[in-house]
């Protein structure tokens, strides 16, 4: 069976799925194999609990056109992306696993088990382009609205001994590292030189020019001599940068001369030429001013949107990827407050996060658990004005009342213990749900993958726990009757 992946430029129509149909019972779903499958399987349970209809409404709004090829159903698209992030499959591995696994086929909404792949690996790229970060954030909100509202939940970080939830919001930021080579000035300039040489060769073949003098063999030999040195001195590094800057400048002059004469490059080379121009200007500025800092510094030619994010941690003082500002409410459900590849101060976003909490719940939280970077005077003043207790010590001199100091220390200890929940969330999202290393090559698909990772962590975390508690309480009530 052949598959054709439709590009986003083509007109695609969508037919909303009729969720009134009854999917075959899971016992008979794989009857062709002559065996019965486990109804307690994790994927079967999640398939019957997720808000597919709410997601269907959001997904159908992405298709304004009523003509064209019919797109795949929403449940197949989101289900496949959820499986991929949860299990860590590549695109080809995902298709083969779905083809072999009846549990996965049930999860993505197939009516019966089939031996034919339900979609092609190339379609996953188009799905990730279509399922944008904004769409995933809305789908994540729909997932939160579908969570059962428990009156007396089990003990969580936001609950008290009486089983009553305290309106709580935890805020923190982390970086989702991008899968790029560790950037060095010499390696970036050498990569830029190689790309420019490739483009120059294309110009010469395409328009019949004689090859200009690029000194590529000498440049390659000089770079290898530098790269083989284990601990190059500062003087050696500057000499290597100066040499590579000269070769890059020469190649850029050749390309600029070609284009000024009216010869156009191939479409696939335009972004590389623009990126190398910016990279050369940045590296030249840092070399001439003897500095290592420049605004909007490029650390990857293939992914020029990636920026260095200074974290100040012992293991990773600088990370390269998108910075994620996350908030978790008292039920353990996480939401993305801000997501960007540019560096920013998360402390300035606390008030926006509190206003978003108020918009969703019609009231401010009783307490907000944050680290030291959020405790600015503006944020403390805002929290005091709106009767929000912000974690951390009070400003001013300590009280002379020993009992008050004892209670304050006890409250601070509980706040520190409860704030660990967001660190735990980051750990699960990075180790288990695909946020540990983003391997997508496009900016939009990288952001949507990070947002999907947050939603998947909610599905198999807080949402799963809330549904399990609800079903447990419901079964106890039924038995008592």
Regions found by a protein language model. Name each.
Residues 67-72, 102, 369-377, 397:
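Acidic, metal-coordinating catalytic cores used for nucleic-acid/nucleotide bond scission
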Residues 313-359:
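Electropositive, glycine- and tryptophan-enriched low-complexity nucleic-acid-binding patches
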Residues 41, 80, 94, 98, ...:
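Short, conserved catalytic/metal-binding motifs centered on acidic residues
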Residues 301-315:
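Flexible, glycine/threonine-enriched loop-and-boundary segments that flank and lead into catalytic domains
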Residues 372-443:
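Helix-centered, glycine/charged polyanion-binding patches within enzymatic domains
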Residues 37-82:
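Basic, short loop/linker segments at the boundary and entry of helix-turn-helix/winged-helix-like folds
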Residues 111, 115-303:
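Active-site- or DNA-interface-adjacent structural scaffold in DNA-acting proteins
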Residues 1-50, 57, 464-481:
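Charged, often Cys/His-bearing segments associated with DNA-binding zinc-finger transcription factors
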């Amino acid at each position: 069976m052949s598959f054709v992946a439709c590009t986003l430029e083509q007109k695609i129509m969508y037919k909303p799925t009729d969720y009134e149909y009854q999917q075959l019972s899971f016992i008979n779903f794989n009857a062709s194999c002559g065996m019965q499958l486990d109804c307690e399987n994790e994927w079967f349970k999640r398939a019957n609990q997720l808000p597919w209809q709410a997601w269907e409404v959001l997904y159908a709004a992405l298709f304004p056109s009523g003509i064209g090829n019919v797109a795949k159903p929403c449940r197949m698209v989101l289900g496949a992306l959820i499986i991929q992030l949860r299990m860590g499959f590549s695109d080809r591995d995902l298709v083969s696993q779905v083809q072999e696994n009846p549990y996965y086929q049930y999860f993505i909404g197939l009516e019966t088990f089939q031996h034919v792949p339900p979609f092609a690996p190339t379609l996953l790229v188009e799905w990730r382009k279509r399922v944008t970060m904004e769409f995933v954030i809305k789908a994540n909100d729909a997932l939160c609205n579908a969570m059962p509202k428990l009156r007396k939940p089990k003990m969580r970080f936001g609950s008290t001994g009486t089983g009553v939830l305290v309106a709580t919001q935890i805020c923190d930021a982390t970086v989702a590292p991008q899968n790029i080579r560790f950037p060095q000035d010499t390696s970036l300039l050498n990569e830029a030189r190689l790309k420019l040489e490739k483009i120059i060769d294309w110009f010469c073949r395409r328009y019949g020019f004689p090859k200009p003098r690029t000194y590529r063999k000498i440049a390659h030999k000089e770079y290898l001599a530098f790269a083989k040195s284990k601990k190059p001195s500062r003087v050696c590094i500057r000499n290597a940068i100066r040499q590579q800057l000269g070769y890059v400048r020469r190649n850029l002059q050749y390309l600029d001369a070609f284009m000024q004469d009216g010869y156009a490059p191939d479409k696939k080379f335009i972004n590389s030429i623009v990126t190398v121009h910016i990279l050369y200007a940045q590296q030249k500025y840092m070399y001439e001013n003897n500095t290592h800092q420049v605004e909007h510094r490029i650390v990857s030619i293939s992914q020029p949107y990636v920026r260095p994010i200074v974290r100040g941690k012992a293991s990773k003082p600088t990370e390269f990827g998108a910075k994620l500002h996350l908030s978790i409410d008292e039920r353990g459900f996480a939401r993305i407050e801000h997501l960007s590849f540019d560096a920013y101060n998360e402390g300035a976003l606390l008030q926006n996060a509190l206003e978003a909490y108020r918009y969703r719940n019609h009231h401010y939280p009783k307490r907000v658990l944050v680290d030291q970077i959020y405790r600015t005077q503006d944020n403390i003043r805002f929290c005091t004005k709106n009767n929000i207790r912000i974690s951390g010590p009070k400003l001013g001199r300590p009280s002379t009342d020993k009992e008050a100091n004892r209670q304050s220390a006890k409250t601070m200890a509980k706040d520190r213990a409860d704030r660990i929940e967001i660190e735990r969330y980051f750990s699960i999202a990075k180790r288990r749900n695909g946020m540990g290393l983003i391997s997508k090559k496009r900016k939009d698909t990288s952001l949507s993958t990070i947002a999907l990772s947050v939603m998947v962590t909610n599905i198999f975390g807080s949402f799963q726990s809330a549904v399990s508690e609800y079903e447990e309480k419901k079964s106890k009530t039924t038995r008592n009757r």
